[in-house]
Amino acid sequence: MSKKNSQTSPQRQKMHVKKGDVVQVIAGSDKGKVGEILRALPQESTVVVKGVNIRTKHTKPQQEGESGQIVTYEAPIHSSKVMLYSEKKKIASRVGYTLTEDGRKVRILKKTGEIID
C-alpha cells in the first residue's frame, strides 16, 4: 500500500471573507482593530488586513553605496481570527447567505441583515 504524504498541498478551504471586505480582528494582540482585507490566501486560510499584524524587516544594502532599510509590512493572520464588520452600525457579525428576489446568492451580516455584496 502506498502511504499518502501529509505534507502535500492542503485542500483549499471556503473562506467567509474576501478581498475588499472590512473586518474586525477578534483574537490575538491586534484584537479589536478594524481594517480592510488587502489579500486573501485560501490555500493557507489566511488573510492580510490593512494595519494589522505589522512586522518589521531589516534589509541589507544590495548594491554598492546603497544603505540598508527597515521595512514594515502586514503579515497574514488566520481567517478564523477575523469577523465581518458593519461600518454603519459599528458592530462585528457572522456571515450568512441568502437569495435575493432576482435569484442571486448574496452574503449578509447576521446581526444587522446588511447585504455585503
From Swiss-Prot:
Functional note: One of two assembly initiator proteins, it binds directly to the 5'-end of the 23S rRNA, where it nucleates assembly of the 50S subunit. One of the proteins that surrounds the polypeptide exit tunnel on the outside of the subunit.
Record-linked SMART domains: KOW
Record organism: Microcystis aeruginosa (strain NIES-843 / IAM M-2473)
BP terms from Gene Ontology: translation
Lineage: Bacteria, Bacillati, Cyanobacteriota, Cyanophyceae, Oscillatoriophycideae
UniProt family annotation: Belongs to the universal ribosomal protein uL24 family.
Name recorded for this polypeptide: Large ribosomal subunit protein uL24
Coiled-coil region: none
Subunit and partners: Part of the 50S ribosomal subunit.
Organism superkingdom: Bacteria
One Pfam family here: KOW
Polar residues bias (residue ranges): 1-12
GO molecular function: rRNA binding; structural constituent of ribosome
NCBIfam families: rplX_bact
An annotated GO cellular component: ribosome
This protein's UniProt keywords: Ribonucleoprotein, Ribosomal protein, RNA-binding, rRNA-binding
Region described as Disordered: spans on this chain: 1-20
